């Protein structure tokens, strides 16, 4: 009987771990977030209400977020009739419904849900504006990180992390990039 050398076994195990993997789904506390239009989002239940749910953390003062507003508006428009729900969440200590409602209306953004105390942000590991989490229809985290690879400029060659994850999930595939770097302003949660 021939025994495989230890180096071969280690290599085989390491290769089995290669490739994209979906991020671990965090334990999300039961919360009801009220948005600027008077609607509510109950987590974690509502995260599995659509084919794909995209949660984007928002900060009114963040120039990185402002730069990405056009891409967010396009994301909402392009996927609205395909079962994709986009939820903007403001976890900042200074967040008010009135200020966020005004900002959403002026900037053409969807209603913004308030996350007092940053409980949802903490549960999802969101420390920066533009941090995005994409959930599948079972409410599992399938992507987490930045909207794309841009920080403060909209480059045509930016890696479209969120759009690619949404397209992959709608096509029944694993997201090709399950994690990306979040580039934005630090959330002032407390």
Which residues are covered by each model-predicted region?
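A short beta-strand-turn-helix
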Residues: 31-53
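Thiol/selenol-based redox catalytic cores and closely related redox-interacting motifs
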Residues: 116-190
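Short, thiol/selenol-centered motifs that function as redox-active sites or metal-ligating centers
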Residues: 59-70, 93, 183-188
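C-terminal motif of bacterial Sec signal peptides marking the signal peptidase cleavage site
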Residues: 15-17
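Short active-site neighborhood of thiol/selenol oxidoreductases, capturing the structured segment around
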Residues: 46-66, 166
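Bacterial signal peptide processing site
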Residues: 19-21
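Structural microenvironment flanking redox-active thiols in thiol-disulfide oxidoreductases
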Residues: 66-107, 113-123
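Bacterial N-terminal signal peptides that target proteins for export
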Residues: 1-8
């Amino acid at each position: 009987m021939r025994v495989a050398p230890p180096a071969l076994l280690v290599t085989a195990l390491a290769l089995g771990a290669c490739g994209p993997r979906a991020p671990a789904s965090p334990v999300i506390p039961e919360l009801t977030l009220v948005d600027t239009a008077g609607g509510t989002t109950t987590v974690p239940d509502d995260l599995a209400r659509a084919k794909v749910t995209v949660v984007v953390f928002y900060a009114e003062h963040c120039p990185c977020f402002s730069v990405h507003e056009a891409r967010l508006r396009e994301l909402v428009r392009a996927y609205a009739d395909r079962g994709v729900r986009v939820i903007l969440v403001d976890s900042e200590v200074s967040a008010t419904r009135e200020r966020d409602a005004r900002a959403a209306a002026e900037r053409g953004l969807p209603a913004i849900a308030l996350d007092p105390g940053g409980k949802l942000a903490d549960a999802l590991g969101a420390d920066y504006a533009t941090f995005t989490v994409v959930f599948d229809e079972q409410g599992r985290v399938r992507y987490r990180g930045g909207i794309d690879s841009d920080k403060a400029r909209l480059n045509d060659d930016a890696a479209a992390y969120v759009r690619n994850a949404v397209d992959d999930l709608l096509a029944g595939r694993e997201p090709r990039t399950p994690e990306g770097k979040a580039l934005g302003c630090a959330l002032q949660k407390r």
